[in-house]
Amino acid sequence: MTIIEAIIIAIVEGLTEFLPVSSTGHMIIAESFLGVHGDFVKLFTVAIQLGAILAVVVLYWKKFFQFDKWEFYAKLLVGVIPALLLGYLFNEQIEAMLESPLTVAISLLLGGIVLLFIDKWFPQPGKGKPDLFATETTRSELIEADEKLTYKKSFLIGCWQILAMIPGVSRSAASIIGGMQQRLTRNFAAEFSFFLAVPTMFAASAYTLFLKKWENGGQPCLGYELITASTENTQAFIVGNLVAFVVAILAIKFFINYLKKYGFKVFGIYRIVAGIILLILLLTDTVQ
């Protein structure tokens, strides 16, 4: 993998990780177009999530470092348990699906149809209440919102997040839909989806770096050993995370501002168009 290829894939990761369009699906498509394959590429696409989740921590640092608010961390833990448990039990099946662009295309289409109607299915509760994403959000407003998010709701949203194990579904879309189904406001559901991404993606990255076995020249190794096996790999890892971090910050700011005004419809249309294009490319053997 060249630095340019690493930058392209990192841009795709940063742009799509927190939008309801599936970052995994888009990276599979990007890899197919770039013609990059192999264990390091698979490791790289997961490891650069570290840069993306750091963007959430930086943007919401006041939230993450309120150590007196222990319930915030407890609710995140409850929300992440379903994905961690199922991810561990069905790791091989999930990895097999990651090799299928057809699965991505179908998931993009079906998810797009859902997003077209999501605002009608789950109308916004509490109209006229303070916007949690307003620039001058007060501490009391955030506390009020946190109190509405019970442990039960956190767990059920985490169950929705399991759907994102299917490539093309989108972790962001699944968890936001789960939040809205639990009667959270659209903006608060998106905010909690960002928070939930941090432990979920950190666990996935840690597993790929320190526990999962990869191959380097036919020899088994751990992820961090594969990254440090060559200067090129190390440079790609560092540059990829930096690019993913910067792009993710911009994408999150765009998304929360857009979501406040317009909702999910445009993302549904995009997913449907992207799914149709990918199906055509698969039928014509342009992408395999």
Which residue stretches match the model-derived regions?
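Multi-pass membrane proteins that catalyze or facilitate reactions on polyprenyl-/lipid-phosphate substrates
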Residues: 1-288
